[in-house]
Amino acid sequence: MAFNFNWSPLMADAGFYTRAQELLTAALNKSPKPPIIVDDIVVTELNLGSNPPELEILEIGDLAEDRFRGIFKMSYAGDAFLTLKTCVQANPLNTYLLTRHPFTSPQPLAAATGLTIPLQITLSDIKLSGFVILVFSKQKGITVVFRNDPLESLKVSSTFDSIPFVRDYLQKEIEGQLRILFMDELPAIIHRLSLRLWGTEYSELETTSAQVTNPSLDGPGLDPLLNPPQDPVDASGNVLSISEIASLSLDSGVEMHSLFSRKNVLRLAALTDSQRTLSLFTPSIREVVFRAWTGSMEQADGPSGLVSPMSPPLSRTHSHIATSSLSLQDAASLASSSHSRPTPPSSGFSGYGLSMGAGRHSKAHARKRKKRVVDLRRRPKSADDMESVSGESAYTETSTTTSAVSVFSGSTIPEENNDDPVTPPVSPQRTIRRPTLRDRIAARDDAERNSRRGIPAEFGHDLPTVRTSPPIANDMARIITSASNLQRQLQQQQPADSKPLPSLQETAPIRTLRPSPSSTPQYPTEKPNASNNYTSSSSPSARDPQQQQPQQLSRPSSSFIMESAQNGGILEQAWMMKMASEIARRIQDEKMGGEDPTNSSSRGGSGGGFWERPSMRSHTPPPAYRH
């Protein structure tokens, strides 16, 4: 079974084509257009042609006087055509940048300038073939649904037919858009057209909606801003009187829309200020923490209690400005109480930092800071006062050798704190006597040698160091203990009428940086018979063969330097250590005078005969190469 369409009435009705063009234009502009199309698509010409489509009935589901439902096979190869007009973007770089995020685009200046070209497209030689479900009803109109894609071929003629690339691109894009049109938009267009033809109620409803959307049909509209508000203000916020409002008109040049209600203006201003400054006008929001709050009730929450005028505290997060917590009173109390836990010195250099708390009550749950203090003050009473206190442990550094004399009882060399404004210098505890002529001559020779070369590594080139390693401290204590025992044996072997040898402290002279006649240091006076026992190196008969064991000489222990550092600086310490080594060297030379100097040098270490015997000098690297 087939149908014969009467195609002539559709071609003769001019209103039908007008309504069809409007519906097609709305349908083409409804979906999002590609970025190359920069203007609306307008249908300028529409002609269905003289050849009607062919329908073949496959199934009839319902048949009555006012309704029909069936499935058809449709074929169309007529002379219908459609003409469209739009504007396209001819610059592909501009089109590319429009589809990309501005953050990732190179932002060219001249190359991205748009070039808009008008475009006219004509669609002809349309060939359709597909299965159609047709439902007809006088009350509901005609509904046409395509079960498959009906478009087989299409010819596209445009302004850019001379450019093959553009022609192929337009052909591909338009075919894709028409396939969407036939499957989605064309059934809705046909349904609306059928309602206009057979449904009078629909036509009246459509006319009413058109009048609402187009107010020009009912005459000129009313200006909603013509009537001023009850409390009008101008653009500057000044309240206007009734006479000033009456003098205003739409033709006087004064804009009537500047008259707003004063209450509304205040609300808008408060809303704007709240977004800028987070002020009190901000409406309260649940479960939201304010980032700033400058009220007086919150300023006392900081632990320091001090507020800088340039940076007020952020009390909502319990921020406060950290101040220097170490003052002169703290330092005085620190010096007075030596056994108490001192304040950490680092707190005085903390600066003005911003410490943030976790919440409003973060101080109660704050984590305790570790207090790590190193006390380097001199304790003349005992060596146990040199303590290093940490947050969890404390340890005491004592002498590594308990059998040594009391002069060498420490293993650390503290730096002399000359910049301490609180702790006074400790006065010397022993009487200083005038040096002998021999000591002054030796001091002058040593000064000349020190002017030619620096103090070697054996005599304290690392004096400023704070700590001495335990092996070096053990060697020094052992050397000084051996020297003391040797001196004690020599005193026992002397006759009863001879005077005893001076102690190691008395023979070590001390000199100041700037000697003056009034404050010249006094040294112990030595007699020839007492000094010959350890200064002369030419009488082999005075030596005991049982005491010819080599003594390794090194610099003295650090506590001896600490005790003698009360009277001077680094030069005094170097001098004292050199003299102690010289005394030990002379005692060794007295015992080892008959032996080979080279062998004695190898056994005696680096301290024997350094200044007088160059052949016995040990091959110790310079101070710069020992670290």
From Swiss-Prot:
Q: Give compartment(s).
A: Mitochondrion outer membrane
Question: What are the Basic residues biased-composition ranges?
Answer: 360-372
Keyword Membrane in annotation: yes
A GO term for molecular function:
lipid binding
The record places domain SMP-LTD at: 1-195
User: What are the record keywords, sorted?
Assistant: Lipid transport, Lipid-binding, Membrane, Mitochondrion, Mitochondrion outer membrane, Transmembrane, Transmembrane beta strand, Transport
Q: Where is the composition biased (Low complexity)?
A: 215-225, 332-341, 390-412, 528-557
Among PROSITE patterns, the record links this protein to:
SMP
**Where do the record's region annotations for Disordered lie?**
209-230, 332-470, 486-557, 586-627
Q: Name one GO biological process term.
A: phospholipid transport
Cystine residue pairs: none
What role does it play? Answer: Component of the ERMES/MDM complex, which serves as a molecular tether to connect the endoplasmic reticulum (ER) and mitochondria. Components of this complex are involved in the control of mitochondrial shape and protein biogenesis, and function in nonvesicular lipid trafficking between the ER and mitochondria. MDM34 is required for the interaction of the ER-resident membrane protein MMM1 and the outer mitochondrial membrane-resident beta-barrel protein MDM10.
Q: Which family does it belong to?
A: Belongs to the MDM34 family.
Domain notes from UniProt: Lacks alpha-helical transmembrane segments, suggesting that it resides in the membrane via beta-sheet conformations similar to those predicted for other outer membrane proteins and porin.
| Subunit relationships | Component of the ER-mitochondria encounter structure (ERMES) or MDM complex, composed of MMM1, MDM10, MDM12 and MDM34.
Q: What is this protein called?
A: Mitochondrial distribution and morphology protein 34
- Protein species of origin: Blastomyces gilchristii (strain SLH14081) (Blastomyces dermatitidis)
